[in-house]
């Protein structure tokens, strides 16, 4: 898999552990060469009767993958120990150059804690969505070619020290 990636990111938060104000934005794209444009194969009928021929469709994976992530932090009062609202929006899209040569790799695996790193398919990106089982929002047969995740958190610091930061939070989250 040969790909070229570009990322544009900006972070204006005031603290990396417990941000009280600012924002964090990133937009990225990963592109592979459109190998099927340089090939004389007709992928609409390619590999219909031959397993080895069908498997060779994925010798050179081609896709374009777009992602956008945004977080904003807003303090509700002044001072060091103040409640903070964090809002989040993110989406991703895995596209293809040839509709008969969709990539089964680099898909999105959505739902769950996002910490296990386990998915049922190879080379999937795990997208956490609290309150759901791991992977439960990726429809079977759709392979997770797109996702959207929206959320908000209300955070309250319990202890903010140089060596330890502890805070309580309530959240609402949704996605597909």
Task: Kindly give the residue locations of the regions a language model identified.
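C-terminal outer-membrane beta-barrel translocator/porin domains of Gram-negative envelope proteins
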Residues: 1-158, 170-171
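Generic long, charged, amphipathic alpha-helical segments
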Residues: 164-166, 170
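C-terminal beta-signal and adjacent terminal beta-strands/loops
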Residues: 172-176
């Amino acid at each position: 898999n040969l790909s070229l990636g570009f990322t544009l990111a900006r972070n204006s938060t005031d603290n990396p552990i417990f941000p009280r104000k600012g924002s964090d934005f990133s937009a990225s794209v990963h592109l592979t060469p459109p190998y099927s444009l340089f090939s004389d194969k007709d992928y609409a009928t390619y590999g219909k009767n031959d397993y080895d021929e069908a498997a060779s469709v994925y010798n050179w994976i081609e896709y374009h993958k777009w992602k956008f992530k945004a977080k904003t932090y807003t303090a509700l009062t002044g001072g060091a120990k103040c409640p903070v609202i964090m809002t989040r929006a993110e989406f991703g899209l895995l596209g293809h150059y040839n509709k008969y040569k969709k990539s089964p790799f680099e898909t999105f695996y959505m739902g769950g804690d996002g910490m296990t790193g386990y998915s049922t398919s190879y080379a999937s990106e795990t997208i956490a969505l609290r309150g759901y089982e791991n992977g439960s929002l990726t429809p079977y047969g759709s392979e997770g070619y797109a996702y959207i995740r929206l959320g908000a958190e209300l955070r309250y610091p319990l202890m903010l020290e140089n060596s330890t930061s502890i805070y309580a939070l309530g959240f609402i989250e949704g996605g597909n």
